[in-house]
Amino acid sequence: MPKPINVRVTTMDAELEFAIQPNTTGKQLFDQVVKTIGLREVWYFGLQYVDNKGFPTWLKLDKKVSAQEVRKENPVQFKFRAKFYPEDVADELIQDITQKLFFLQVKEGILSDEIYCPPETAVLLGSYAVQAKFGDYNKEMHKSGYLSSERLIPQRVMDQHKLSRDQWEDRIQVWHAEHRGMLKDSAMLEYLKIAQDLEMYGINYFEIKNKKGTDLWLGVDALGLNIYEKDDKLTPKIGFPWSEIRNISFNDKKFVIKPIDKKAPDFVFYAPRLRINKRILQLCMGNHELYMRRRKPDTIEVQQMKAQAREEKHQKQLERQQLETEKKRRETVEREKEQMLREKEELMLRLQDFEQKTKRAEKELSEQIEKALQLEEERRRAQEEAERLEADRMAALRAKEELERQAQDQIKSQEQLAAELAEYTAKIALLEEARRRKEDEVEEWQHRAKEAQDDLVKTKEELHLVMTAPPPPPPPVYEPVNYHVQEGLQDEGAEPMGYSAELSSEGILDDRNEEKRITEAEKNERVQRQLLTLSNELSQARDENKRTHNDIIHNENMRQGRDKYKTLRQIRQGNTKQRIDEFEAM
């Protein structure tokens, strides 16, 4: 019994381990991987490994795994990666798993600076990545520092701006909050729609030379072949769509591309190693096949997948609507509960206020009753004193009258009578004065007693109002709510030194529709506005001395009004012969 081979396959978000037989082919292993992760759009992907010479290589599907140049390690390591890219992610990617794998791979490419991304776009993409991971921003859940462990922006961008890590996170948090209501899957798609407009997105670069020996870059992507100058990977100078190519072949380091235009010469370049020509051929064949397939009616399988994806998307929307309805209902009940508690607290406060007012009124009433009794007692004493003084005065008058009679009846000494008379007269005057004062006091006490009586009557009326006021209404009673949320290409098959492949262009519907495209920022005003705002914000913190060569090229392209698709239209102008001649002259 042959000993099994342990294999570890690393996808963008998981590690899978298998035990395969020595005679297992690359396709059998590939099929096992895609079945495990539930992927049906298999044509974009491949298994990559590092060969015995340290070069990254795609596993050949038609050969045994053990017969290829894989390293003898346990387990044998493979990466499951996108080998080919769609032209337009929004139109072509069908399954959520496909979309997620592309999102993670493109994000990694941007963060590692494999794909150049300008600062304002990097921040906006970072906010979509946060939405894709965390969902809607929630102030209660997403406290300060919730992004501290996330890789969000290329290190190059952070180094170029005088902003702390916290300030970067604050900016991304603000834009994260802007995406409220967006599904995680939708956030991934928005990320890819913006990322696919980056100049280096989806391109495989190879070092080549033309017949003159000029060092150049060959870019192979979903739309065709592009030629770049050695110091500029952002701006292609010449382009050839796949629909213009009928045959590709190589012999050793020489690569020959035959155009459909019979009058045009062959497009010839040289690669430094035979291995590179094999990879170029493999990518050309696969990209050409997908380019042509996209321009033909969908196969039955793709139609079924799209129908299923639409149904799943519709189901997700229904589930989301149900969740939103439940969430709104829950929020309404929570608000009602909070309102009830507030009203209850207000009623309790009002009740306490009533009780305090009642106690104060009772206390004031008691004090006023006591004061009124004191005033009444003082008035009574003053009245008695006044009556006593009046009695004394009357007695003095009687005595005076008696003395006068005695003076008339008796003859006394004039001096004695005069003295007695003067004495009683003075006493009478004093008593008269005292009587007047007492009368004034009595009048004043009577006035104060009347005021006290009026206050007493008023206080009794207030107390009567408080005591007879209706009690506060009881707090409303809410029934508890029961929540129920439903969960619910070909591969390398090259000969040792050479290979040739015919590329058919028959039956396609529109071979150059990619030249009509515009960027996401150009067709989406919201994205355009967000990028402009971010650019203005970041310009104030930018350190111009730390700009890279790619930054300078990108800014110059922006200044001249160029973008990926305008450049594409420009580099395909003229016939095939003119462009090949231009390539030879570089």
UniProtKB/Swiss-Prot annotation:
Residues 302-462 form a coiled coil. Residues 244-586 are annotated as: Interaction with SCYL3. InterPro entries: Band_41_domain (IPR019749), ERM (IPR011174), ERM_C_dom (IPR011259), ERM_FERM_C (IPR041789), ERM_helical (IPR046810), Ez/rad/moesin-like (IPR000798), FERM/acyl-CoA-bd_prot_sf (IPR014352), FERM_2 (IPR035963). One of its GO terms (molecular function) is protein kinase A regulatory subunit binding. Pfam families: ERM_C (PF00769), ERM_helical (PF20492), FERM_C (PF09380), FERM_M (PF00373), FERM_N (PF09379). Residues 308-338 have a biased composition (Basic and acidic residues). Glomerular epithelium cell (podocyte). Expressed in cerebrum, cerebellum and hippocampus (at protein level). Expressed in the small intestine, lung, kidney and ovaries. Probably involved in connections of major cytoskeletal structures to the plasma membrane. In epithelial cells, required for the formation of microvilli and membrane ruffles on the apical pole. Along with PLEKHG6, required for normal macropinocytosis. This is Ezrin. It comes from Rattus norvegicus.
